[in-house]
């Protein structure tokens, strides 16, 4: 399940459980489906699902607002609705930034400190 820009599917998750846990493919599939169903059921009830070191799934209520039809420019009321939000944990953010192309906060902060010390030594 490694690679960039690739979409991981249920089948991929089931295969990972099969490979790493040692359950049969049928049991792995049932396990993944059970976990996803439990998360879905909790979110339907408006509960927050917090997975330590991963993040939280939560449902937020959005109020009614006025939008615009992009074709006509006419104002259109947008009904209130519930939306699902994912908030990644600090640990997940660090792991993503450590493996990604963007510099981490600590390395960019140290680069700023290095620049300050270099300019101070020149004066």
Swiss-Prot record:
It holds the Pfam family Bac_DNA_binding. Gene3D superfamilies: IHF-like DNA-binding proteins. One of its GO terms (molecular function) is DNA binding. Residues 98-111 have a biased composition (Low complexity). InterPro entries: Hist_DNA-bd (IPR000119), Histone-like_DNA-bd_CS (IPR020816), IHF-like_DNA-bd_dom_sf (IPR010992), IHF_alpha (IPR005684). Residues 97-123 are annotated as: Disordered. One of its GO terms (cellular component) is cytosol. SMART domains: BHL (SM00411). HAMAP family: IHF_alpha. NCBIfam families: himA, PRK00285.1. This protein is one of the two subunits of integration host factor, a specific DNA-binding protein that functions in genetic recombination as well as in transcriptional and translational control. Heterodimer of an alpha and a beta chain. Belongs to the bacterial histone-like protein family. This is Integration host factor subunit alpha. The lineage of its organism: Bacteria, Pseudomonadati, Pseudomonadota, Alphaproteobacteria, Hyphomicrobiales. The gene is ihfA.
């Amino acid at each position: 399940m490694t690679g960039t820009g690739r979409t991981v599917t249920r089948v991929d998750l089931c295969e990972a459980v099969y490979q790493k846990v040692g359950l049969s493919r049928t049991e792995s599939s049932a396990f993944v489906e059970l976990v996803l169903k439990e998360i879905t059921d909790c979110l339907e009830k408006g509960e927050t699902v917090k997975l330590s070191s991963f993040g939280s799934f939560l449902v937020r209520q959005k109020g009614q607002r006025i939008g615009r039809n992009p074709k006509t420019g006419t104002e259109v009321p947008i009904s209130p609705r519930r939306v699902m939000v994912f908030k990644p944990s600090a640990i997940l953010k660090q792991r993503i930034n450590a493996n990604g192309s963007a510099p981490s906060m600590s390395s960019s902060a140290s680069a700023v400190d290095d620049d300050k010390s270099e300019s101070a030594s020149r004066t």
